[in-house]
Amino acid sequence: MLTKTKSDEIKTQKDSTTGSYWITTFGCQMNKADSERMAGTLEKMGYTRADNELNADLVLYNTCTIRDNAEQKVYSFLGRQAKRKHKTPRLKLVVAGCLAQQEGESLLRRVPELDLVMGPQHVNNLENLLGKVDLGNQVVATEETFISEDITSARRESSICGWVNIIYGCNERCSYCVVPSVRGKEQSRYPNAIKSEIQKLADDNFKEITLLGQNIDAYGRDLPGTTKEGRKENTLTDLLYYIHDVKGIRRIRFATSHPRYFSKRLIQACYELDKVCEHFHIPFQSGNDEILKQMSRGYSIKKYKNIIENIRSLMPDASITADAIVAFPGETEKQYQDTLKLISEIGFDQVNTAAYSARPNTPAAVWTNQLSEEVKKARLQEINDLVEKTARSRNQRYIDNIESVLIEGLNPKNSSQIMGRTRTNRLTFVEIPKNINFNFSLGDEINVRINEARPFSLTGELSL
């Protein structure tokens, strides 16, 4: 950990008074979960949530570095806050997350107004780090460390659906990905600690949990113990069986899965366990074996298709979503077309797409066969058009179906509708009946007859 005494021109008043805070989160679900935990820590310290970042006494950016445009957004936000700090010296400015881990002390040189730079492994240490800031220091916390148990009381954004981290970090070495260098090695939480957190959520009337990990089906590889069959004693499959009996929790989801570890045993567990939802997010990244090899993904298209076939053999209506990268270095037109072909063949419910973006300290970033921005833009547009077309077609299967929808709130764009999600994770809007006395609470499950399908959402009416 680096601790520096601030120079006079950027020194914050030496004052431990709290005030208000604002957190802006960039990136993935893991970052969202981390932000909830940091918000909980700040409120435990006495901070209150500001109505906007311009009124906050502490501004925290929880950052992403998976693509360059995410980084540039952060620097744009920081520039505005740096100017504000010269007018409001007591402002505390914090950068957390993957960009903080990647850049470390160099962030202080680029933005000397910063008070604290902290990587993802230090989320649970926020209070101690801010204590050092209150003593008049600039602090950089990016050293690799054992992640302290997740005992913070998160300030959950939802009162119904809760994130639960079960494994931190990533041991994979995909040639394009910066995550292992910024999130560190895999660290699995112990099953009893995970179950205790889920029980706390159930006690607080949460109805749905999503288990989180960079490669969630790698859970338990670093934990001790093996079975007499020679497999690891604590796997994601074992964890699902272990937590399934927590009373009050109705739905269990997990993300993100790696095809390399997605086993038949896991699929069988998802089929047998009533609370586990029929929604699987399994990135394929490319539809071409040679590109997958260059990406160091560790599986073939044949293996990926077998996973999907095994899921659909037991759960034919399961929702399958994925991630894909186009314009990877050296990707030919034919290799790119293989990706489009896979999307059409599988029939994904949704695919998160991105054009390849070179990231620091990754092998692919220095390859000489980078594709042009024009090719990236064209391929990204074409794949997005196909994804939307496929998703629209897939959603047609819901028309006239009666689906169970977990109510999450009112539609913010239409107060005459409530919204929630199906077990297959389809966002669903439901017209509030006017001709009957219909009382509902957040977390209720209602039966909805679907009468309209768009690419990424459904609309329906209450089925009595």
From Swiss-Prot:
Subunit structure: Monomer.
Lineage, broadest ranks: Bacteria, Bacillati, Cyanobacteriota, Cyanophyceae, Synechococcales
Entry function: Catalyzes the methylthiolation of N6-(dimethylallyl)adenosine (i(6)A), leading to the formation of 2-methylthio-N6-(dimethylallyl)adenosine (ms(2)i(6)A) at position 37 in tRNAs that read codons beginning with uridine.
MTTase N-terminal domain residues: 19-135
Residue sites binding [4Fe-4S] cluster 2 per the record: 170, 174, 177
Cofactor(s) this protein cannot do without: [4Fe-4S] cluster
Source organism, top-level taxon: Bacteria
Cellular-component GO terms for this entry: cytoplasm
Record's protein name: tRNA-2-methylthio-N(6)-dimethylallyladenosine synthase
Keywords: 4Fe-4S, Cytoplasm, Iron, Iron-sulfur, Metal-binding, S-adenosyl-L-methionine, Transferase, tRNA processing
Stretches assigned to the Radical SAM core domain: 156-394
Listed NCBIfam families: miaB-methiolase, MiaB/RimO family radical SAM methylthiotransferase
Domain TRAM: 396-464
Family: Belongs to the methylthiotransferase family. MiaB subfamily.
GO MF annotation: an example: metal ion binding
Gene Ontology annotations of biological process type: tRNA methylthiolation
Family annotation (SMART domains): Elp3
InterPro entries: Elp3/MiaA/NifB-like_rSAM, Methylthiotransferase, Methylthiotransferase_CS, Methylthiotransferase_N, Methylthiotransferase_N_sf, MiaB_methiolase, rSAM, rSAM_horseshoe
Free-text cofactor note: Binds 2 [4Fe-4S] clusters. One cluster is coordinated with 3 cysteines and an exchangeable S-adenosyl-L-methionine.
Binding-site residues, [4Fe-4S] cluster 1: 28, 64, 98
Reactions mediated catalytically: N(6)-dimethylallyladenosine(37) in tRNA + (sulfur carrier)-SH + AH2 + 2 S-adenosyl-L-methionine = 2-methylsulfanyl-N(6)-dimethylallyladenosine(37) in tRNA + (sulfur carrier)-H + 5'-deoxyadenosine + L-methionine + A + S-adenosyl-L-homocysteine + 2 H(+)
Subcellular location per the Swiss-Prot or TrEMBL entry: Cytoplasm
One Pfam match: TRAM
EC number: 2.8.4.3
Chief place of localization: cytoplasm
